[in-house]
Amino acid sequence: MSYVLNLDRIALYIHYERELSEDEKTSIKQYLKKMVEENKTFDELKGEKKDFKEENLDIFNKSVEYLKKNGVPNPLLDTEYIFSDVLKVNKNTLKYSMSREIKEEDKNKIREMLVLRAKKRKPLQYILGEWEFYGLPFKMSEGVLIPRADTEILVEQCIQLMREVEEPNILDIGSGSGAISIAVANELKSSSVTGIDINEKAIKLAIENKILNKIENVNFIESNLFGKLDKDFKYDLIVSNPPYISKDEYETLMPEVKNYEPQNALTDLGDGLHFYKEISKLAGEYLKDTGYLAFEIGYNQAKDVSKILQDNNFAILSIVKDYGGNDRVIIAKKAIKAENFEEIEEEEDVNLSE
C-alpha cells in the first residue's frame, strides 16, 4: 500500500480515510497477483526496481536554488508546495515520497510552476489554484484577494465575540474568496453569515468555496457596501478586512502582490482610511443595539481607525496584535446614545417603584 501510494509506511496511517483511485487499486492488484504467480515477497519485487531518492532530491534541491537565485521569498517552502501539489502528496509527508520515479510529465509541470514563480513572480496561491485558511481549503484565482495568515486573528476574534450569542447574524463586508465568512460559519454552526463584495468574480469564487467546504449557513451577495442590504434587518456583528493600504505604500509592494492581486481589494488609492469611514458611518444602522464591529487594520492605523469609530458612536473594546506584534484587529461595540440612556433610566425607575 505505502509503495503504491508513494508514501513511507510510517506515514501510511495518515491516509487511511482517503479513497483509493482506480489506478491505485489496479496497481495493488497487479503487485498481489505477481507476488502469488512468482512466489516472491513484495520486498523482492520492489528490489528489482530502481530507487530514485537521490535523483529526486537533486531535482528538489536545484529547484530551491533556482527560486532563491531569482529572489523568491521562502524558496524552500514554495518548492515543497509545488512538489507536493504535482506529486499529489501531503506536504508534511513529502520527504517520504522521494524514492519513487517522478514521471517526465510531472517534471515538466514542476518546471512550469517554478518558472511562473521565479520569472513571472506569480503568487504561489494562484499557481496552485488552492490555499488553506483557518484549516479549510479554498480555491484561489487571479482577480480575487489571497487570504493572509494574519486575517485568521480577525476570524478568531469574531468567533469569540459570537460564541455565546444565540443564532447570531453576521455580515462580512468585502468577503473576497469567502475565507472569513466560511471560516466563521464553519465554527459557529448556529450562525447565519452573509458575505458581500462588489467583485462579481469574487462572489462566484466564494460560492465555489462554500460548496467545496459544504457550509450551509453562509450566503454571498454582490453589493457595493450596504447598497443591496435590507435596512430593517439587523446584525449581531459586522466584520471587514477592507482595502487599507495607502497609495504610497501600495507602490512599494512586492511584484507578487502588486502585479497580480486586485488593486481595489488592497488600496483605496488614498490614505487607506476611506473604507473605515464609509463602513463606520453606516454600520450602526445595520447593527443591533448590542452589535459589534470588527476590522482588520494596517500596522500603523489603530489610532486613526479608533477615532473614526468613536466619531461614529462606537466604543473601542480591544486592539489585537498579529503574530509579528503589530496592531492588526480592532473590535468596537455600538454605543448607546444619550437619549437611549434616559429611556433606560426611566424604565428602571418604573420597575424599581413596582
From Swiss-Prot:
Reactions catalysed, as given in the entry: L-glutaminyl-[peptide chain release factor] + S-adenosyl-L-methionine = N(5)-methyl-L-glutaminyl-[peptide chain release factor] + S-adenosyl-L-homocysteine + H(+)
GO biological process: methylation; translational termination
Keyword Nucleotidyltransferase: no
Organism: Fusobacterium nucleatum subsp. nucleatum (strain ATCC 25586 / DSM 15643 / BCRC 10681 / CIP 101130 / JCM 8532 / KCTC 2640 / LMG 13131 / VPI 4355)
Keyword hit for S-adenosyl-L-methionine: yes
Lineage of producing organism: Bacteria, Fusobacteriati, Fusobacteriota, Fusobacteriia, Fusobacteriales
Enzyme Commission numbers on file: 2.1.1.297
Record protein name field: Release factor glutamine methyltransferase
Leading EC class: transferase
Similarity-based family: Belongs to the protein N5-glutamine methyltransferase family. PrmC subfamily.
Role: Methylates the class 1 translation termination release factors RF1/PrfA and RF2/PrfB on the glutamine residue of the universally conserved GGQ motif.
GO MF entries: nucleic acid binding; protein-(glutamine-N5) methyltransferase activity; protein-glutamine N-methyltransferase activity
Binding site for substrate: 241-244
Gene (name only): prmC
Keywords: Methyltransferase, S-adenosyl-L-methionine, Transferase
InterPro entries: DNA_methylase_N6_adenine_CS, HemK-like, N5-glutamine_MTase, PrmC_N, RF_methyltr_PrmC, SAM-dependent_MTases_sf, Small_mtfrase_dom
Binding site for S-adenosyl-L-methionine: 174-178, 197, 241
Top-level taxonomic group: Bacteria
